[in-house]
From Swiss-Prot:
It catalyses: a 2'-deoxyribonucleoside 5'-diphosphate + [thioredoxin]-disulfide + H2O = a ribonucleoside 5'-diphosphate + [thioredoxin]-dithiol. Expressed in roots, rosette leaves, stems and flowers. It is found in: Cytoplasm. GO terms for biological process: deoxyribonucleotide biosynthetic process. This is Ribonucleoside-diphosphate reductase small chain B. Fe cation 2 binds at residues 107, 169, 203, 206. It holds the Pfam family Ribonuc_red_sm. One of its GO terms (cellular component) is cytoplasm. Transmembrane segments: none annotated.
């Protein structure tokens, strides 16, 4: 059997202990983008959300939001475990480790934000504890968590694992993000929807980064294997947001949501250099106004472009960033 080619980004070298000179400008710019996008949970105003929660939402809508937040709160912990126990030790280049280090900080903020939202909305201690322990107590969350965890605990190749976690951040969050943006379109829950915009932008960048790292591997997955991982994630997400926790609870169409998940998967496949599988268009035109890069904002609030401008100005002009590795939802097919 022929030996596999060595992977430079996975091969230990003394250079990994020093940040400069930059060897991978695209990775460095991704890191600076992440740094420029830093935010904290204290910046999200939840004062109106309590009024909307009590007076403007139906019981079905409250049920949906509770369980979506329970999934989000649990999933960020899984992403954190993967970063700290696998990817940070797998990848041997300092620019990528800088990104992962910052991603760990941001995932902690996401986890804090989701936990704070549950703490704010759910007054009953027993119910709140049930939701905080969603991986153990809510079967549809358990199934998604088990799928993600098998890529942390298993012996799969790095290429398989990086694709799987691109699916976690690019597909497993897609239906829930979309449903919360639907509430934003209706002018409800401004704190929840503002934090959702910040978090979806962050996760879009994390997914972009996974695609970029994958593109640097010399040995990539064969197309059938790559598609199998992505399509498996699509089926699990479809079951979650169309059946187990149906988006109909917030007034969204099941068939269109299923198509939207397929659309997101095709975008991810393209970003990974693979042919699309589903060949569908985005059924939610209003989502095109909110790409996963956070390009716009429906209302008067800041965010979309919320970032530290001085940080990004320091990298433009000296870091070659290639849009081929950007995973977004506002492009034509």
């Amino acid at each position: 059997m022929p030996s596999m080619p060595e992977e430079p980004i996975l091969t230990p070298t003394p250079d990994r202990f020093c940040m400069f000179p930059i060897q991978y400008p695209q990775i460095w710019e991704m890191y600076k983008k992440a740094e420029a996008s830093f935010w904290t949970a204290e910046e999200v105003d939840l004062s109106q959300d309590n009024r909307d929660w009590e007076n403007s939402l139906t019981n079905d809508e409250r049920h949906f939001i509770k369980h979506v937040l329970a999934f989000f709160a649990a999933s960020d912990g899984i992403v954190l475990e993967n970063l700290s126990t696998r990817f940070m030790s797998d990848v041997q280049i300092s620019e990528a480790r800088a990104f992962y280090g910052f991603q760990i900080a941001i995932e902690n903020i996401h986890s804090e934000m989701y936990s704070l939202l549950l703490d704010t909305y759910i007054k009953d201690n027993k119910e709140r504890d049930h939701l905080f322990r969603a991986i153990e107590t809510i079967p549809c969350v358990t199934k998604k968590a088990e799928w993600a965890m098998k890529w942390i605990n298993g012996s799969q190749s790095f290429a398989e694992r990086i694709v799987a976690f691109a699916c976690v951040e690019g597909i497993f969050f897609s239906g829930s993000f979309c449903s919360i943006f639907w509430l934003k379109k209706r002018g409800l829950m401004p704190g929840l929807t503002f934090s959702n915009e910040l978090i979806s932008r962050d996760e879009g960048l994390h997914c972009d980064f996974a695609c970029l790292i994958y593109s640097l591997l010399r040995t990539k997955l064969d197309e059938d294997r790559l598609k199998a991982i992505v399509c498996d994630a699509v089926e699990i997400e479809r079951e979650f947001v169309c059946d187990a926790l149906p988006c109909a609870l917030v007034g969204m169409n099941r068939e269109l949501m299923s198509q939207y998940i397929e659309f997101v998967a095709d975008r991810l496949l393209a970003a990974l250099g693979c042919a699309k599988v589903y060949g569908v268009s985005n059924p939610f035109d209003w989502m095109e106004l909110i790409s996963l890069q956070g390009k716009t904002n429906f209302f008067e609030k800041r965010v979309g472009e919320y970032q530290k401008a001085s940080i990004m100005s320091s990298v433009h002009g000296n870091a070659a960033f290639n849009d081929d590795h950007v995973f977004k939802l506002d492009e034509d097919f």
